Amino acid sequence: RRVALPTHARPLHSELLAKQAAMEEALESAPWNRLALRGKVGIIASGIAGLYAEEAIFELDEDISFLCIGAYPLPKRLISRMLSHVSRVLVIEELEPVVEEQVQILARIANPNVEILGKEGFIPREGELDYFLVRNAIARMLGKAERQALQNPAVSILPPRPPSLCAGCSHRATYYAMRKVFGKKAIYPSDIGCYTMAVNMGTVDTCLCMGASITLASGIRFGGETEGICCSLGDSTFLHGGMTGLLNAAYNKARITVTILDNSTTAMTGHQPNPGTGMTATGEATVQVSIEALARALGAGMVETVDPYHMDETIESFQRAKEYPGLSVIIARQPCVIKARRSGARRKPFQVSEDCIGCKICLDFGCPAIEFERDMARINALCTGCGVCAAICPSSAIQEVAR
C-alpha cells in the first residue's frame, strides 16, 4: 500500500491531510508558538525575526501585541486570536511573504477590517533581516524615529578580499593550464565546490547546482556555440551528480571537454571521503571507484589523467582535449593541499631571486603566497612548495629553497 499506484495514492492523500491537521492542532499549544495580547497594534514574526522583534519592542517600550511563530503548519487559531484583538498588524519574515499571505486569508474571517502590513514598504523580500532593519520597520509603523544602523569602520578601512583558492591548491594550476589552451573566447561552465573560488581566473562562467557544469556545457554546445567549451567539477561532485550528465553528453555526441578536479576529498564542506577515495565516512577501507573507468564506461572518447603541478604536461593534455572531435575528459589529480599537509606531507618552499624582472605573471597567477614589493615578487610563509609559480616564471627567477 506504500507504492503510490492510483488506487493507493487517493487514500494516502487523505491520510496525509489528516496527519497535517493533527500536527496543526498539536502546534497550537506548542512552546515554539507564543502569543501575548496587549495593545491594538500587533506584530506577527517567524523564526529569527521573532527574536529581533522582541528586542525591538522592549527598546521602543510600546504596548504591542506579539505572536512569535516557530513551527509549521502555522497556528491558525493563534493567528486568528491576534487578528481579532488588533486593528493593525505587521508581519515580519525573511524573503517571500509566506506567513503574510496566510495572515491575509485568515483575516477575511477573523477581522476583515484589520490593516496588514509587511512586504509592501516595511520588510524587504531579499537578503537577511537584522535587528536594526526590524526595529526601524516597527518604528515606521508606529510613526516613531528610526535609528541608523551601527557602522563597521573595518568595512571601509580593509581592502576587498576577492574569492581565492588556498596557497598551493592544484585547482589553480589546472585552471591556469585550461585558460592557457582554451583562451578568452571559450565558455567555462563550472560547478559547486571550492574550485568556484577560481572565478577571478576567468574559468568559471556558471555555477548553478551540483553536476550542472556538464549539462550546461552540452546545452550551450547544442544551442549553437562554436567556440571551445571546457567545463569543470570536482571528483566528489562528479560522483554525486555529474555521471548522468556525462552519459548524456556522450549519448548526444557533445563536443565538449569535461575537467574533473580530483583532490581526493570533499574539501569545501569538511574533507569528507567520497567513493573515489577507498574509504567510508567512518574510516573503513572500501572499494575505490576509478573515475577513469567510469568516464570511459559512460562514453567519453578521450580520457587522460594529469598531475596539475606538472604544468607542461597538463597544457599538452588540454591541447589534445581541445582538438578532440568528441567528448573528452581530463582528470586533474593532486591531493588537496590542506589534507596533504595534515597527513605530514611537506615540500620545499620556493623563493624569488634577483633575476626577477617584475613582469607580475606570477602575481596574476593569484596564489596567496605570492606578493609584490619594490618592483619584485616575493614569496611569503604561505608557500606550500607546489612549484607551479616557478614553472610559469618567464625569467626562471623562482627557485626552490636549498636545505
For each feature predicted by the language model, list its residue ranges.
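Short helix-loop-beta junction
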Residues: 55-66, 184-185, 293-299
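Residue-level detector of anion-binding/catalytic polar loops
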Residues: 65, 187, 255, 301, ...
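Short hydrophobic segments within beta-strands
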Residues: 44-46, 189, 232, 259
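Active-site diphosphate/adenylate-binding microenvironment
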Residues: 148-214, 223-226
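Thiamine diphosphate
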Residues: 197-331, 341-343
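Flexible, low-complexity linker and terminal segments
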Residues: 1-165, 170-171, 308, 316, ...
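Structural motif
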Residues: 41-42, 88, 187, 228-230
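Short glycine-enriched loops at secondary-structure junctions
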Residues: 47-49, 191-194, 262-265
